[in-house]
Structure formats: C-alpha cells, structure tokens
Amino acid sequence: MMNKRKRVEELGETKHRQVRQRILQEHKNDILENLAFELSDKVRRLRSNASLLASTIRMRGEMRIAAIPRAQRNMHLRDLKNHLSCNVSATPWRTKIKEFYNLDELSSQKSARQPTKTVASSSSSSSKSTTVSKSSSKSQV
C-alpha cells in the first residue's frame, strides 16, 4: 500500500500556499507580458526588414525592366525570337541615325576622296610653291 500524504490544515500553511501561488501568478503574468513585448518587437523588426527587402527587390525589377527597350517590352516570345533571329547587329536608334545622316554613303565617299586628295594636293602644292619661289627669284635678279 502506498502511504498517502496527510493534509495538514493549519492556518499558517494554507496562507503560505496562497501567498506562494499569488507570487507565482504575478511572476507568470510578468513573464507573459515580457514575452508579448519581445514578440511584438520582433514582429515589428521583421516587418521593417521585409518592407526594406521588398523595396530593394522592386527597385531591382524596375531596373531590369528599364534595361529592356520599350519596343520589345510587350512582344510575345515568338515575336522576340523572330526579331532576334534576324541578324540585326545595330540597335534601332543607330539604324535611324544611319538613315538620317546616310553615314554609309558619307563614309564611302570620304574614304574614296580623302586619300587621293591628300596625296595630290600635298604634291601639287609643294611643286607650286617651289615653282613660285623660283620664278620670283628670277624676276628679282
């Protein structure tokens, strides 16, 4: 048989138990309040970090979108594939500039003219200057 503990019902012991329980309950309440405060603080910090991360991710996405030309932003994948399969080496704004200034024609004309002009003009100007100087020296004598 098990020996059961006898209950002592003295006034001192019952008061001691009640006081002890009251302190424990107050202590539990304090611990719960501290825990609630710590949790709310942690939630606040996590939310602020999450909003910061969300804003940086949003900014990165906007930067990536800004890198795509406006004409290609609404294209379907097949259209983009067709566009990229064409061997277009120059970007659209460069082709527009070339069309406006006709750079291909100007560059071919300049390359055809410049070497002959510089060679001919430099040799003829030097010969003219020598002939002029000879004739002027003869007239003075």
Curated annotation (Swiss-Prot):
Q: Where is the composition biased (Polar residues)?
A: 106-115
* An example Gene Ontology CC term for this record: mitotic spindle
Q: Which residues form a coiled coil?
A: none
Which organism's genome codes for this protein?
Schizosaccharomyces pombe (strain 972 / ATCC 24843) (Fission yeast)
Known role? Has a role in meiosis.
Record localization: Nucleus
Extract the InterPro entries matched here. Answer: Borealin_N (IPR018851)
Tree of life domain: Eukaryota
Gene Ontology terms describing biological process: meiotic cell cycle; mitotic sister chromatid segregation
> Residue ranges of region Disordered?
106-141
Q: Mind listing the UniProt keywords for this protein, alphabetically?
A: Meiosis, Nucleus
- Please give the name of this protein: Meiotically up-regulated gene 118 protein
Sequence ranges of Low complexity compositional bias: 116-141
